[in-house]
Amino acid sequence: MSGDGKGDGSEPDGADPGAADLTHTDESGEAQMVDVGDKPDTARRAVARGTIRLRSETVDAVRDNAVDKGDVLATARIGAIQAVKHTWETIPMCHQIPITNVDTDFALGDDGIELTVAVETTGKTGCEMEALEGATTGLNVVWDMVKSAEKDADGDYPETGIESVEVVEKTKRPLE
């Protein structure tokens, strides 16, 4: 196997033929970071979105900035941005990339909050993992901020859940 992730069929004896398509393992199956050094720099953008289901009373408290712990959305925004900036430290084999912009947008519904995180970079690899980390961490921060309001009498969270986290946009364009 060439280790270039191109799946050229030159696997060593006994190697898994499907392993030729794996870009995060070397010839012996050990984890490795993909070499992006020869790729050209491009302008890249990724957007991820997710939702946290909450009791309607909790959403109202967030909307009215009446949660005991403080401003839920401001805190979640900071958490999302911090997560974007530190993705390379938490996702194995993820490159540290120069983040040029992060936008967060919260949409409060009747029984939940949707968070959209847009990340931009100029570099050799994409930023969708950063957008996903921002969305999931931002939603986790919302949960942390409102958990006392969401707990039932047994200390459980029967109406609370994070769902539908997905990449909704991924673009790249040559630098001008």
Label each residue range with its predicted role.
Residues 2-68, 73, 78-81, 85-95, ...:
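C-terminal binding/interaction regions
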